[in-house]
């Protein structure tokens, strides 16, 4: 999962006073913002769905956020991609902002258009403090995106062991699969991060679970040429002759991708052609 931050592009249809307000939030001039907000709707959304509160969260303007709530700002209004202010705080790793938004009624399980919760995005961006605050506030660590990915999948994909530990200690399930049938071990086998693989195996992840194509984590290691990963999997009981849906075992995958060292390793352990 790769997330692109909001660009905050402006339409020529936006009023000059609205654009000035946005700039005032960016530079942190609260008194000027108060003047500009006189007689306006604090919950007005521009063509991208942004509100003054949304912008204040992005720029980490705590004083603006608190003032906007005094004016009746809606904490859960999302932009045109479904991102709420809490999503933005998670992306930017703003634990104090997260607490403020949560105290004002922010939906901790809100999903954007891709099904990502704030915790998904914190995990994806490596925002440890934000993730910790969300978990402590009761965020569901096993929530799935539209692709079936969990926050654990995201933290594994980004090789963040601290976040993985946090999620595991908070009840993250190792065996959950994304829409392609891939577990967290499939993901780490692709990325080639040995310490994370060892940690997941220590926690009891099932090593021979197949994805939707019938391929195991060892198939992935063979595909990407991760020799030490393949060795680790074999010593932990990986089935060296497991066949995918197309009938290919890890050794066939290694041959197809030119990973000769892995071919030799599999032959050493008795892999059949």
In which residue ranges do the predicted regions lie?
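Ankyrin repeat structural motif
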Residues: 29-37, 61-69, 94-102, 127-135, ...
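Solenoidal tandem-repeat scaffolds enriched in leucines and small polar residues
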Residues: 145-158, 178
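Ankyrin-repeat-protein effector appendages
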Residues: 8-23, 170, 203, 236, ...
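Intrinsically disordered, low-complexity regulatory segments in ankyrin-centric signaling systems
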Residues: 8-38, 47, 58, 70
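Ankyrin repeat A-helix N-terminal signature
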Residues: 23-28, 55-61, 88-94, 121-127, ...
């Amino acid at each position: 999962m790769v997330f692109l931050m909001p660009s905050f592009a402006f339409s020529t249809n936006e009023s000059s006073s609205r654009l000035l307000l946005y700039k005032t939030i960016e530079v942190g001039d609260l008194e000027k913002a108060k003047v500009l907000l006189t007689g306006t709707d604090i919950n007005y959304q521009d063509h991208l769905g942004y509100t003054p509160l949304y912008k204040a969260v992005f720029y980490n303007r705590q004083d603006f956020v608190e003032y906007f709530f005094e004016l009746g700002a809606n904490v859960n209004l999302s932009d045109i991609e479904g991102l709420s202010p809490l999503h933005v705080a998670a992306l930017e790793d703003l634990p104090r902002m997260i607490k403020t938004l949560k105290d004002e009624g922010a939906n901790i399980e809100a999903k954007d258009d891709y099904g990502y919760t704030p915790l998904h995005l914190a995990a994806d961006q490596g925002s440890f403090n934000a993730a910790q605050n969300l978990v402590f506030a009761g965020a569901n660590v096993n929530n799935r995106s539209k692709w079936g990915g969990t926050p654990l999948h995201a933290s594994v994909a980004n090789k963040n062991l601290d976040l993985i530990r946090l999620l595991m200690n908070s009840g993250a399930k190792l065996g959950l699969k994304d829409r392609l049938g891939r577990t967290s071990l499939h993901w780490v086998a692709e990325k080639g991060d040995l310490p994370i693989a060892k940690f997941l195996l220590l926690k009891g992840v099932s090593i021979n679970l197949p994805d939707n194509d019938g391929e195991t984590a060892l198939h992935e290691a063979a595909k990407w040429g991760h020799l030490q990963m393949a060795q680790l999997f074999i010593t932990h009981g990986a089935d060296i002759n497991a066949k995918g849906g197309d009938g290919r075992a890890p050794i066939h995958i290694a041959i197809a991708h030119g990973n000769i060292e892995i071919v030799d390793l599999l032959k050493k352990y008795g892999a059949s052609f």
